[in-house]
Every structure is written in C-alpha cells, then in structure tokens.
Amino acid sequence: MASSSSVVKPTPTGPQVFICFRGADVRKHFISFLVPALREANINVFIDENEFLGSEMANLLTRIEESELALVIFSVDFTRSHRCLNELAKIKERKDQGRLIVIPIFYKVKPSAVKFLEGKFGDNFRALERNNRHMLPITQKWKEALESIPGSIGMPLAEQSERTDNDFINSMVIKIQQLLENMAVRRNNEIEAQRKLVSIVPPKKPKGEANPQGGSMVPARKPEREASQEGSSVVPSMVPARDLDITHSEKPQKWTWSTINEAPNSAEIEIATLNKVYWLKIVGTITTENLTPGAKYEAVFVVKLENNASGWEQPVNLKLKVVQHDGDDDRVDRTENLNDYIGQNWVDILAGVFVVPPKTTPATIIFTMYQYEDKYKKKGLVVKGVAIRPTN
C-alpha cells in the first residue's frame, strides 16, 4: 500500500497509445515495467487490464479506434490468441486508413519468424488456423495482418540479447515520445492548412467563468427554440437518440429505451437512459449537404442527469470532427463536468461549433461524447439526441 505522502500524478490526456500483447509471462516480465515507464513519461497508454476476466472484444476494438498509436508486442505465443489476432486485424485496418501509427515490438522472437510464420510462432498460427478452418474470412484477415504489420519499422529484442529489458524499455519510451511530438506538429500544420477550406470554431469561454479542468468551458443551456416567420417556435434540427451510435445500447442491463411526450398532442420522443456502465461512448454524424454554406452551426448533446445519477466524478470528453470529401479532417476537443447538472432538466452539452463548407465540397460532421474512466460505474444519464442549430 502506498504511503499517504506519495504523490498521485494526473492521468495523461494526450493521444492514446494502445498496447496489444499476449500472455501472463509477457505481462509479468515486460508489460508490468513498460506501462509505468510510459505513464511516468506522461504518455496516455491503454492496456487490457481485464485480459483474464473476459473483456468484451467490442470494447477493445473501440479503444483501438480511439488510439493514434499502437504498440504490437509480438512474442512466441502471440499467435495462440484469437483476441490478439482480432486486435491485430483491426490495427491493420486503421493503419491502412491512415488513422493509426503502428510500432511492432519483437519481444524475444525474430522479425522474420513473425513475418514469414516460421518456427513455433508459425506453428502456433497454423494450429489456430486449422482449428478455425470454418472461419476462413477471419483467418485470412489474421494472416494478412501478420504479413503487413511486421513490415513497419519496429524494435527487436532478441531472446539471447545482452541488452536488458530496462534499457530496451527506455529506448521505446524515447521513440514513442518523439513520434507523439512529430504527430502533434504535423496535426497543427494540417489544421492550419485545412482551415482555409473548413473553419472549426472553438467554444468561447463566458466572461468571468473559469474552467477548473484547464480547457475551454461553455456552460450547458436549456434547449432553445427558434422563432419562425409566423412567430411560432420550431424545434431545431435534431439527431434523435435512436440514430446515435451508443455503445451497449442494445443491452437492457446497461441502457433502457423509453418514450416521452413533451407537450400535449406532440409526437413521442424516444430516449435512452444509462443504467450502469464503465465505458461511455456516444457517436453521431450528419452531412453538410442540407446546411447553409458559410453559416456557423453548433452541435449539442441534449441530455439530463437524473437525481440519482452517479459516477460522474471525472469530466466527459467531447469531440467534433469535420471530415472532408477527400478524407482530410479537422476537429475540436473539450471536456465538460456532468456532475454540475445532476437533478436539472434537459441541458445542452456543446460538442463544438463548425462553419459549413461550400456545396461543392460537402463534409461529414462527427460528434462524440465519451469517457473511459473505469474507476467509477456511471449511471443516470438520459440522452434525447444531438441538436444541430445555427449560431449568431
């Protein structure tokens, strides 16, 4: 047990680094030293802490999608694991899309044995392939990933190497720090160039309002209504909850679906209520084809937190991304503390503000609310949808 005088460092919040590995031996003798070293260097690293408790594969694949860099720790027993090979196939997919940088680590196994499926590494794969011959499309993806990923520039540690694991880990940390720094510089340059085509407007901080989290804070608001030319009010364009991609929303023990009527004779609105989860992820998309070019719009999650809501000690992350027709993208990230809204009525949680590009270059707007803090189970969040409305 740590002494009461020990200093607890804040959790890193930079680009996520996903680690794919296999086996208790690798975890005990390598990963258990690598991960603390990365976190000590303020690198935001994710590993499957619940490897032996049957973590859901969908959660791990989502983690890969949220990562910008992946470390694949190839060891002799790597190819004995369905889980690792499924992760590897997803890593290859993201790499091929240009969404993920991959560093293969050859831990006491030859790079050639991995790439050409030689020795025990290859024997393990062929045995797994035979046992799953009825799953040919999946095993083919495994094989393609095993051929592709080792081709990236990696770092080998031979079985009989005179180099210590500690020395090897230190060199890994330095390499990863350099990569993350280069990624940050490249991203800033890309954003500056892309703003000539699509403007993303960061949320403004109200005067006199401090943000305890250190980022830009925009207070949640009650959903607004716009006046029509006839003087009546109309509800802003809404992406309903059912059209959002809410992780685990199909599982009644985690989310409950119900309907509400906000006014007499009004249409029913379907809402999703969070029962209890560790990982929260809600994603929605729209295209700009039906929006006014050059106009500024905001995307806000319309939610409320019930009186018994809990598990919101850490803020949620909000991301708005504009993906252009040529695959380029720009984005804004911010955080919001939902604890402040427990027991209130419907509020708007700002995802971001964007300027619509010309009709000739339409874009897809992706808005995300997520929080992967696995220390607290979250409950009591009610989701109505995401409102898209013009701003002044």
From Swiss-Prot:
<dbReference type="Pfam" id="PF14299">
    <property type="entry name" value="PP2"/>
</dbReference>
<dbReference type="GO" id="GO:0007165">
    <property type="term" value="P:signal transduction"/>
</dbReference>
<feature type="region of interest" description="Disordered">
    <location>
        <begin position="202"/>
        <end position="236"/>
    </location>
</feature>
<keyword id="KW-0378">Hydrolase</keyword>
<dbReference type="Pfam" id="PF01582">
    <property type="entry name" value="TIR"/>
</dbReference>
<dbReference type="InterPro" id="IPR000157">
    <property type="entry name" value="TIR_dom"/>
</dbReference>
<feature type="domain" description="TIR">
    <location>
        <begin position="13"/>
        <end position="180"/>
    </location>
</feature>
<dbReference type="InterPro" id="IPR052147">
    <property type="entry name" value="PP2-like/Lectin"/>
</dbReference>
<protein>
    <recommendedName>
        <fullName>Protein PHLOEM PROTEIN 2-LIKE A6</fullName>
        <ecNumber>3.2.2.6</ecNumber>
    </recommendedName>
</protein>
<feature type="active site">
    <location>
        <position position="87"/>
    </location>
</feature>
<dbReference type="InterPro" id="IPR035897">
    <property type="entry name" value="Toll_tir_struct_dom_sf"/>
</dbReference>
<dbReference type="GO" id="GO:0030246">
    <property type="term" value="F:carbohydrate binding"/>
</dbReference>
<dbReference type="GO" id="GO:0061809">
    <property type="term" value="F:NAD+ nucleosidase activity, cyclic ADP-ribose generating"/>
</dbReference>
<keyword id="KW-0520">NAD</keyword>
<dbReference type="InterPro" id="IPR025886">
    <property type="entry name" value="PP2-like"/>
</dbReference>
